[in-house]
C-alpha cells in the first residue's frame, strides 16, 4: 500500500454502514465519525478545515460548493449490500490514491464511480 493512499482522511456521515468504517480503519486510514444529528453545515466545515473526504448517502451534499466542503463521496451502492460497498470503495481508492481530491464530488456506484468538480460558490 502506498503512503500517498494513506494520506486520504475520511469523515463518515451517520448514515454510512459501519462495515465501511471498519474496513477503512483496518486499512489504517484516518477515519472520523460524527455525533448523530450533527448539522450539515458543521459537517461541511469539519470536512473543509480538516481536509477530510466526506462520505455520505445524502444527496444534499452533492450541491455544496468547493469553498464550503473539502470533497464528497456520495454512496449510491445499496446499504443492504455492505460487501458490494466495500468492493466498490476499494476499487475507487485504488484509482484515486495518487490524486488530489480537493473540490471534487465522487459518485460511487456498485460497478463504477464518477469524479466531477463540486460547484463554485455563487
Residue ranges and their predicted role:
Residues 34-40, 60, 77-82:
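Short, acidic/turn-prone active-site loops that include or flank metal/cofactor-
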Residues 40-45, 67, 81-90:
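Short, charged, surface-exposed secondary-structure boundary motifs
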Residues 47-65:
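Acidic, metal-binding active-site segment of PIN/NYN-like and related structure-specific nucleases
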Residues 73-111:
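Ser/Thr/Gly-rich flexible loops in soluble cytosolic domains mediating phosphotransfer, phosphorylation
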Amino acid at each position: 500500500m502506498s503512503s500517498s493512499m494513506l494520506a486520504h482522511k475520511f469523515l463518515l456521515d451517520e448514515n454510512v454502514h459501519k462495515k465501511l468504517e471498519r474496513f477503512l480503519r483496518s486499512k489504517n486510514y484516518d477515519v472520523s465519525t460524527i455525533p448523530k444529528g450533527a448539522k450539515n453545515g458543521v459537517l461541511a466545515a469539519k470536512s473543509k478545515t480538516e481536509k477530510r473526504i466526506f462520505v455520505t448517502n445524502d444527496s444534499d451534499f452533492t450541491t455544496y460548493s468547493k469553498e464550503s466542503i473539502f470533497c464528497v463521496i456520495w454512496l449510491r451502492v445499496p446499504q443492504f449490500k455492505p460487501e458490494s460497498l466495500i468492493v466498490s470503495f476499494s476499487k475507487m481508492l485504488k484509482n484515486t490514491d495518487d490524486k488530489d481530491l480537493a473540490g471534487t464530488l465522487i459518485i460511487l456506484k456498485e460497478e463504477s464511480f464518477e469524479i466531477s468538480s463540486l460547484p463554485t460558490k455563487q
